[in-house]
Amino acid sequence: MPEAHGAAQMPRIETFHSRSMADLQPLWRCEQPNGHLGPARQHPWGALHRPDWDARGLVIWPRGGLWRQLQLQLVCPPDWQALAHQSGALDEVGLGITARLALRWWADQVELWVDGARVHRGDLFDTACRWRLPASWWQGVPLELELCLRSPLHDDGALISSAVVLEPLDPEDPLGLLDETKLALQDLRAGSPGPEGHFHVLGHAHLDLAWLWPVADTWQAAERTFGSALDLMERFPDFHFGHSTPALFAWLERNRPDLFARIQRAVAGGRFEPINGPWVESDCVLISSASLLRQFQEGQAFSRRVFPGLDHRLAWLPDTFGFGAGFPAIAQATGVDWFCTHKLFWNATNPFPHRLFRWRSRCGRELKALMTAPIGTDADPVAMERYRLEWTAASGCPEALWLPGVGDHGGGPTAEMFEQLQLWQGQAEAAPQVHGLLRDYLARLEPHQEHLPVWRDELYLELHRGCATSRPDQKRHNRTLERLLREADLAAVLAGCPAQQPGCSAQQPGEATDWRVLLFQQFHDILPGTSIPEVFEQAEPQWRLARRSACRHRDLALHHWLGSRPAGGDAPLWWACQLQPLAASRQVLRLPAGSWTWNGQRLATQPASAGGGWVQLPPLAGVAALPLVRQQTMADEPAAIEHPVRLERLAGPDGAAGSDRVMDRWRLGNGLVALELGPEGVEQLWDANGVPQLAAPLAWQRYRDAGEFWDAWDLAADYAEHPLAWGWDGDIQWAEQGPLCTSFVRRGRCGSSAVRLEGRLRAASPWLELVLSVDWRARHELLRLEIPLQQLAQRWAADTTGGVIERPAQAITPREQARWEVPAISWMASVPKSGGLAVLLDGPQGVSATPGRLGVSLLRSPTWPDPGADNGWQRLRLALLPCTSDWQRAQVPQQAVRFREPLWLRPAQPFSAPQDWGEAVPALPPLGDGLLLLALRPDSTQNDGLIAVQNSSPLRRHLRLGDGWEVIAELDGLDQVLQDHQSQAQNLPISLELRPWQIRFWRIRKR
């Protein structure tokens, strides 16, 4: 370690400007460009590159993980020594005053060394210290300080403030050391000598499961944080601590049982408060309604099991990046009635107008909502009072919540924080403090409920608009695993076997269809793609293992349900199974080569360019299975093709329509949708009535996307002003032509990235499928599809977590204008005066809309915190669906399900007695217009099914399960009985009503 400079080289400590505080910023020394030590504040780099920070008195150095070593010899001035003798600070009792070294920094690693010994460590999250100076310093012994700081990779580093602060040990403060702060408190209240309200104080430690550290670090941070909190409870009798995230408690229960037992005892004693809710602090705009429901079901079930003495009516999500409009419906159905967040204070444009309000979903369910105090705070009395005044002015409530504790990477409250709280507890100028549980605080807010404003919209975060597009691999993993888990649950119900039997869904952790792997990866810094590379590298094998387990579990259950093929049969029997209760439709699939028959009827086939053949299946309605027989020889004449694809050449030089290149313009259609191809690609699209959809050709565009501090989180607001080149190589080529499937291919380059676009139209399909494959090699670029609309949209709709939301196409208000990019989970649709155009997505994407345009953000390439984010081979799949009526009558939500959830196709199992394999095997009828199946899973205690259905339309709908099922009881979202159903005793089909946008739950049983 370099030696500290001598006292003669530094400004005299007597230059301190206050009796109670000495500013150290001018006194630090560092190596200058000439290699000599000099004042750190005078280093030329800061004034040149960060004049804004330099003007604030910060010590600054460059970003990129660079270290800066600061040195200072700290000497107690004679007048302070005299003050200490006067106060008795040097006697054995230790009464009088104390001195603390108060530091604040912006650095990702910090070490404070005093006389060669390290006394404190910090980082980007533990950003301050108040180290108590030893008694020897008061006696004139200088302290050699060395402060080692490393700048963040993404931002310049700074020592924000440094000072020695004197504090009285006697609450009476006979020396007036607190006078300056007391005057500041009075100034905040415009001269009022005393406060009219008080604080409710709860220690807290926000703990991200992964972010700038891998998950393994989180377990260690949780262990340290909870152990520290329990130790502080023994030292400070008033100390109460609250923490969320059942996933963390579950890890402690399994891996640190002794610590978890201490937590349970502290919970029983009313000092440690689990403020849980969902399984993790998940993203709430990129996950489906089914996943959000399961988040709450798993979290609530765990909380009720391990903390049985508490009511669990709280969703604590302080840091999640916005919330879908349907969130209240799902949360309230699972026993939650309070919702707390802080993130909307991050709005970059329009401050959120409420601190305390009622948040109502479109179905009428609502939550009481609290915008909490900041997280990661300390016990600074001025900051506390400033917040309390803002809270009281905004809410009308005199009692403000305060949450001291180091956050993000854990840590929680420190002893220094509570010593400072105790110091100010007895000061008349400071607001009184009440230490207690969050539940008690919320209970005292309950009387305000009737007078609270009602918010009937999504909670859109005006920031972090790039999260829906960054790291598409995580969105793809999430979509696939969720589908497999839902299918495994449904298959277990169809198989009719207990939850613990192989091939059926399990409800306990560690079983094959344990949802908790998926739920954990939906954490709000993993699924959005805003973590370091190690997080995603370590998640990859977990994704793969969970997919394989869920797939195996589903297949076993489906084979158990369907039985086996006839013994001794010559032709292989296959099953084509639809696992969503959708309306009847004929689908075209690519199957292994051969002649395929159903019920003795040969099915229409067409050779496929990628191998095998295209086959049009008979209509499948609801959840059902078709038995298909594969033969090597041709049977009788095939069945007629429904809505065959026809290709027509419109103009151009000599050449047949069957040539392998498109030389001019071609028209492609199947009676449900038609398109025109030309030199500019897809130049027009028509619906079934021949209404044109495009005002100009589809535009695949590339932009510069740079300059944002939160790189992986934020789209550049000015990206449209910085277009980049995109070139197509040659003409469009036909990949295959035929009545069942016709597809074209176009290749090109955008910068260093090779691009392949495939368009595909199948018989009887109402949409044009587009698949963009990209070898993405970019930095700070954005890839988008822009769709110019022929019919101007008045509004536009998209699905969101918990439901559907419609927005005005023409943004008028500042809040509407701020929503220039929003997340969509699986579809968006324009809403003109009649008809419209829908875009079906294969997973969450960032989307946008104006009256004349729909847009989809496809790929980004941020460099922080993951330098290689998004780069590599990417496959993006979407479809264009013209609507002859609005999106509701066109059943766009159901079409989106059909688009992204393929049929299950497997050979039948052998070794069985003969059965009748002619007709389809029905399981669950189509739910009906506007209804979506969220879940059908086995009951863990009975041989029943638990079904959750959502009405995705603004009209009342009726669910009819048909003769094969009886309804046992209506449930809430936690499987508790709300109402027994008696009408099933009459052996008649039951019609179950769902109000607009409503979610309902039932226990059902196969007849």
Where are these regions (language model features)?
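Beta-strand-rich ligand-recognition modules
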Residues: R104, Q109-S161
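C-terminal (or distal) subdomains of carbohydrate-active enzymes
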Residues: F327-I330, W346, R355-L356, M371, ...
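Histidine-centered catalytic/metal-binding microenvironments
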Residues: P2-H36, A40, S162-H200, E482-G594, ...
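Extended carbohydrate-recognition surfaces in non-catalytic/accessory domains of CAZymes
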Residues: M1-W80, Q86-G88, D283, H524, ...
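Alpha-helical scaffold elements lining the catalytic groove of polysaccharide deacetylases
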Residues: C284-R305, T372-T392, T742
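Catalytic grooves of carbohydrate-active enzymes
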Residues: H206-L212, D217, R365-R565, S834-A908
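Aromatic-lined ligand-binding clefts that engage carbohydrates, nucleic acids, or primary amines
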Residues: Q81-G116, W575-L579, L589-R590
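Catalytic alpha-helical scaffold of carbohydrate-active enzymes acting on polysaccharides/glycoconjugates
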Residues: R189-V201, A221-F236, W251-D311, G322-A333, ...
